Design a protein with these regions (language model features):
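Membrane-interface interhelical connector segments
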Residues: 65-84, 152-196
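Transmembrane alpha-helical segments in integral membrane proteins
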Residues: 97-117, 200-227
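N-terminal juxtamembrane cytosolic/stromal segments of multi-pass membrane proteins
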Residues: 1-61, 65, 73-88
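Alpha-helical transmembrane segments with an aromatic anchor "belt"
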Residues: 82-173
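Alpha-helical transmembrane segments and their helix-start/interface "positive-inside/aromatic belt" motifs
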Residues: 26-48, 125-140, 229-238
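Interfacial loop-to-transmembrane junctions
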Residues: 218-243
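Juxtamembrane boundary at the C-terminal end of a transmembrane helix
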Residues: 246-262
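Hydrophobic alpha-helical transmembrane segments
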Residues: 87-103, 173-211
Length: 262
């Protein structure tokens, strides 16, 4: 419990200590590397459960109605749980976990690829350490706030503003490629801030602060765990920032069968 509280304190007030790793201790033989990777994956899995379970219990996530497997009743019934509820919970839990896991994987690929390309890498484990702690804390926080925006009527203006920004980002790429695609929700429309409440402003400020923490943690991870220069660390952060662009381009290519070149 004390260690958990210390990590929370470090994540807020000492991010350099939170994402920093003992590089000398991490650089060892293959067996030590495997052990370090295993520990980091356990940390990520634990944080993933802490992130996804409350969201799932709160009703986040969509899962089409489906009959629970008969074998599930043998496990859930003795625990006093309905097989149908348990099956619905498990499917929504997987969905809620999938987004942050995919984001972490893309972040790791971009982060480690960048430090490798700039020849500042001290190994895979320091990169994994950086990404595990930055995504399971800060990026998970960003996702949580976005989920909250989508379900709370009291911060509807903030939700509309975030959705509008997301659609503008996607349509900028769609228009740049000349793709003939239309999002189900249509093109972005202007959002009036006249009706924004203090709750809307607080939600947007919280989102901005957590996102800033995430970006800064990647910068610190590159500087501390890989000994990168300020310029190299900045380039690494910019590389990670390009992953949403790559994701949208990939989605366009999958939708059309190829990527149009304007």
């Amino acid at each position: 419990m004390r260690r958990t509280l210390t990590q929370v304190y470090d994540a807020i007030f000492r991010p350099s200590r939170f994402v920093g790793a003992n590089v000398n201790r991490m650089q060892g033989r293959a067996v030590q590397d495997v052990a370090a990777v295993s520990r980091l994956l356990v940390v990520f899995a634990g944080n993933l459960v802490i992130y996804a379970v409350p969201l799932t219990l709160a009703g986040f996530g969509t899962a089409p109605a489906a009959a629970a497997p008969r074998s599930l009743a043998a496990v859930s019934t003795p625990l006093g749980l309905s097989p149908t509820w348990t099956w619905d919970f498990l499917r929504r839990f997987v969905q809620n976990s999938l987004y942050i896991t995919l984001a972490a994987a893309l972040t790791f690929a971009a982060f480690h690829g960048s430090v490798q390309f700039t020849r500042s890498s001290t190994g895979v484990v320091p990169s994994l350490h950086t990404v595990v702690y930055s995504t399971s804390a800060y990026l998970a926080g960003v996702f949580s706030v976005v989920w909250l925006l989508s379900t709370s009527a009291s911060i509807a203006v903030a939700d509309a503003l975030v959705l509008n920004a997301q659609k503008r980002f996607v349509y900028t790429i769609i228009d740049a490629t000349g793709a003939s695609l239309v999002l189900p929700s249509g093109r972005p429309t202007p959002v009036s801030l006249a009706d924004a409440t203090p709750a809307d402003q607080a939600a947007l400020a919280t989102l901005a602060v957590i996102l800033g923490y995430f970006v800064y943690s990647l910068y610190l991870g590159s500087r501390i765990n890989h000994g990168a220069s300020r310029l190299t660390a900045t380039l690494t952060v910019l590389t990670v920032g390009l992953t949403p662009v790559v994701f949208v381009l990939g989605s366009i290519a999958l939708s059309l069968g190829s990527l149009p070149i304007p």
